[in-house]
């Protein structure tokens, strides 16, 4: 029975027939959570005031652990730091756009390597099976979040992956769609 459930879960992961379901009950539950969060936020304010009073006198252990933590954090670059470093670079660099037609999942690593080198990548999944294209797109989207990149859908099976220093004017794409929904979508169904 457990094996059967495992297969059903795997199959349902790839199933896209239920994509158009409306999530109205979720909106109602969010409103209830917001109403319940208002009295809780007043309690949190009182607790945070008490915490700040006790935290104003750090102990010797807290000071030492903070120093150890800072030495380890020197090697870690946060996302805002990466963005600032890209904004400070001179604009004389030329941006290149690579066109990739992945045929297997392993090609996604090559696409991410191009993003690491600050190159734009236009990806067309027309030569991949739908399931492989979804997995590849998941990997690329995750890598773009980590590397502060941007992934936008520009066609039925085409996506544009850009580094942080490239701005894409998506306004023209929405005008060309003539009322069609062009929001980001992982579904690669071809009609």
From Swiss-Prot:
GO terms for cellular component: cytoplasm. Transmembrane segments: none annotated. The keyword Kinase does not apply. It holds the Pfam family SepF. This is Cell division protein SepF. Disulfide bonds: none annotated. It comes from the Bacteria. Cell division protein that is part of the divisome complex and is recruited early to the Z-ring. Probably stimulates Z-ring formation, perhaps through the cross-linking of FtsZ protofilaments. Its function overlaps with FtsA. Residues 21-96 are annotated as: Disordered. Keywords: Cell cycle, Cell division, Cytoplasm, Septation. Residues 57-69, 86-95 have a biased composition (Polar residues). Homodimer. Interacts with FtsZ. The gene is sepF. InterPro entries: Cell_div_SepF (IPR023052), Cell_div_SepF/SepF-rel (IPR007561), SepF-like_sf (IPR038594). Belongs to the SepF family. PANTHER family: CELL DIVISION PROTEIN SEPF (PTHR35798:SF1). Residues 25-56 have a biased composition (Low complexity). The keyword Cell membrane does not apply. GO terms for biological process: division septum assembly; FtsZ-dependent cytokinesis. It is found in: Cytoplasm.
């Amino acid at each position: 029975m457990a094996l059967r459930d495992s297969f059903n879960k795997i199959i349902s992961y790839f199933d896209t027939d239920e994509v158009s379901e409306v999530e109205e009950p979720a909106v109602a539950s969010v409103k209830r959570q917001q109403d319940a969060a208002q009295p809780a936020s007043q309690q949190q304010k009182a607790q945070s005031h008490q915490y700040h009073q006790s935290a104003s006198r750090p102990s010797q252990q807290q000071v030492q652990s903070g120093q150890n933590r800072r030495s380890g954090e020197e090697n870690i670059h946060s996302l805002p730091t990466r963005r600032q470093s890209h904004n400070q670079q001179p604009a004389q660099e030329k941006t290149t756009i690579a066109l990739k037609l992945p045929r297997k999942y392993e090609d996604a690593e090559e696409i991410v390597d191009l993003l690491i080198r600050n190159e734009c990548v236009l990806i067309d999944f027309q030569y991949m099976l739908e399931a492989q294209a979804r997995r590849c797109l998941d990997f690329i989207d995750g890598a773009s979040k980590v590397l502060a990149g941007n992934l936008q859908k520009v066609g039925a099976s085409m996506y544009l992956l850009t580094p942080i220093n490239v701005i894409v004017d998506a306004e023209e794409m929405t005008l060309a769609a003539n009322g069609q929904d062009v929001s980001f979508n992982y579904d690669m169904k071809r009609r």
